[in-house]
Structures are given as C-alpha cells and as structure tokens.
Amino acid sequence: MITQPLMKDGSTGIKNSPTAMAAMVNDVIEKSDVLKNALGDTRANGEDPSSLRQIGQVLDSLPKYRNAFQVGLWNMVGMILVNNMYWKNDEWVRKTLKGTLEVGDSIEDIWVEVATPEQYNANGASTLTDFKKADILSRFHVLNYQKKYQRTVSRKDFRQAFFSFSGVYDLVMRIVDTMYNGARWDYFLACKYLLARKINDGVMKVATVEDLTNTENIQDFLIQVQSVSNDMEFPDEEMTEAGNINSTAKTDQLFIPRNDVQAKVGVKALANAFNLEYAEYRGVELKINKFQFTPTEEKRLAILFANDPGYVPLTEEEKTALNSVFAVHIDKDWFFCMNYLFEFYEFEDPSTLKENFFLHDWKVISYSPFRNAVVYTTQSPTITSVTVTPATASVGKGAQLQLSAEVVATGFASKKVSWNVKGATSDATTITPNGLLVVGSDETATSLTVEAISLADSSKNGSATITVPSL
C-alpha cells in the first residue's frame, strides 16, 4: 500500500516570527506531560521575549526536560514541516515520487496487454469454455536507496536558542534545512542519474532534432514536440521499452527540457505545442539544469553512490553524448520511485552534552519499461554491429545454453535484439526472447545457427554456430 502525507491546512513551512515561534513552543509543551508539569502555567508569549527565556531556564535545568522538548520539537518538525515541505515544495518529489511503500521492501509493476479482437461468427463453434490467457508483463522494483544524514547540536546551541524567538527558529532550521536540503538534492541527482543512464542504455525512443541555432530550427523543434505529444495519446508500442501497447494523455505527460532550451524556446510556445493553457503546461513540465552532470554534481554523485553495487558510472563518451540531449518526454509514471522510510531520530551523548540528529531516507528508485519515453537529441540513432557470445558452442540434445548479444550503438539507439534459430528439425528446439537456447531431445540436426537481429536496424545482426553432437 502506498500513502502520501498531507497537511490539513496546506501550510508548507514555519514562519520566522515571534507569534509563530511562540505557538510552536507552546504546542510542544502542551503535548508533553513532563513539560506541562515542569512549566506549570508558564507559556511563550510572542510579545514578551522574557517568557521564552523563562522556559529556556527550566528546560536547561534537567536533561529530561531538555530531552522532552527536543524530542517534541523534532517530532513536530519531522512529521509536519519536513514531510509537507518534502512533498509539496519540491517539484521533482511531487511529480516523480509516488508515495510510501508501507509493506515489504519490493513492489511489482504489472502490465496487462490489450485484448486481441476476433471475428464474430454466428454459426461458428461455441468458445464459451475456451481459455484466453491475458498477455501479462511484470517487473519487480526493490529497495535500492538507503541514505542517512546527521547533524549535531551542542548544549551551548540549545541555550542560545532561547535568548530570542529567532534563536528557536535558527535552531530548527539549522537541524532541518541542512538534512532536508541534502536529501532533496540527492533525490534529484538520483533521478537525474537514472535518466542519464537509461538514455545511454537506449531504452527511449529517439526524436532527432536540429541544433536550436535559429528561429526555423526552434519552430521545427516545437513541431516535433507537438507531434510526439499528440502521438503519445494514441495506443502504440513504439515508445515503450518493453514493446507493450500504451498511451499517455497530455495531462499525464512529463516534459523535461534543459533550462537553456526552455529559455530559448519559451514557455508559452511550449504550452502551445502541448495545446495546454500556461498553468496546465506548468503541471507537465519538470525543470532540469542539464542532462550532463556539473563538476559539483559529479563529486556529490560519487559520495552518494560510493560502494553502491547498482551504480554504473557514466563513461566519458556517455557524458559527452548527453550534451546533445535537449529534452526528455515521458509518461508521468515512467519514474517508479517511492519512499520506504523517511524518518528522524535523535540521541544525546551524556559524555559530550551533544545531541545527534539523524535523517534516514530509504527509497525505491526505478523506472517502468511499460511507459512511454522519448528523448530529443541532435544525434541520429545508429547500430554499428551485433556480436553474439559465445560464437561457437557444443550443446547436447535436451540441454540449454544462454547466449548474449553485444550491440554497439551510437545516438542512443535501442540495443534490443530479436533471436531466432535456424537449421532445427525439432519443434522443441527454441530460443527465448532473452537468448536462452533449448535444444530438443529429439533434434536430428548436427549444426544450428543462432541469430541476433537488431530491432533498431534489421540489416545489423550477429550469429553463433551451435554443434549438436550425436548420442
């Protein structure tokens, strides 16, 4: 089950004002029996800073009072402020993160293909008891992103916070902002890496455009965007990696242009290309600085994914190729990302009188191969070669062999291939879409040829010769 936290009043942050700070402090006190017993009727008054200092003196007198206040304050900030800011104030979170996975550490993405029509025949045999199995595709997405952030607040920091209402605000923001902003930035970088990785892997349909050096090319780009947006509304298999039939309504599309491309083309012109009002277009647009990583982002990415087994660094050639990408155009459900755990914890070290605060951010960060996805680039997709491994092998009757195809491509061309086997005499000799060869136990042929044919360019193929020894 996936849930998304919501705020009743729609507020998105804590105001830095005496009235707001006094209300926050009093709310923490009212929710704690320990603090109510310690403070009695003493409460913060936004018009009287001395009331805050009185509270601070009581809280600082015993560790249990101080801890009770900090835990209460942190729970409020963590459950209300941060969750709400995280969901509502960040465009990437709001438009790509689906919610929170409450049970288990994986989720299955299931796609049921459209039913195939059959000709009606009033005089034909009854098919009432015939079994028509649905064509079902599925993919599992697992917990693959576990990060934590830490900040330390000293006893001195806590004392100074109660000298003024702005001091309380500064204490909260010092803890919250640094960790929250770090988590938010890292999520953006993880999504950006996912886009960059999958663009280079050739899983998106390529729309080749000219460089935006003049008005004519800009107009042609807008025409291309409009054409793709319109085509997405019609069921087809051309824009999905899995080859399933899908469609995407305009309001369910996400258009991710580079900042410089958006500035050059113009937001109003892009809105017209989508045939949407300006406000509606803002709902489908997602901003990105560039598809290549800046030096600062490169450093952060290296830290973020250090020792991560699922991280495949971009090669220099792949980084250079990303400079040619103007925009990505996807179904809003192409990103398959959700929270698994987004929680705060605190711990006080009695030996140093310092309080450590921790933010744990665990996520599933993935994508759906069943959703439409298009990349706009100045490059043209080209297949250079297809090589099958192993090139030769001996496989006995009734045995199996896993083959692989290495596709050398440029321009983000699809690296998918179709497999077939030639020379077989047995119907039991087959090869799966993933290249698993099964030799039938009744096979009489002594030699088979396995071919891998590029789906992007059928003139490019590779082959392997398989010897079937006689028993």
Spans of model-derived segments:
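Low-complexity "stalk/linker" and mucin-like segments enriched in Ser/Thr/Pro/Ala/Gly
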Residues: 422-437
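Long, contiguous amphipathic alpha-helices that act as assembly "spine/axial" helices in icosahedral shell
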Residues: 135-207, 356-359
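Short, well-ordered beta-strand segments
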Residues: 411-426
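A short beta-strand micro-motif common to beta-rich folds, especially ectodomain repeats
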Residues: 444-457
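Extended, compositionally biased alpha-helical segments that mediate assembly or anchoring
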Residues: 1-74, 287-381
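Solvent-exposed, low-complexity, repeat-rich "mucin-like" stalks and linkers
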Residues: 385-414
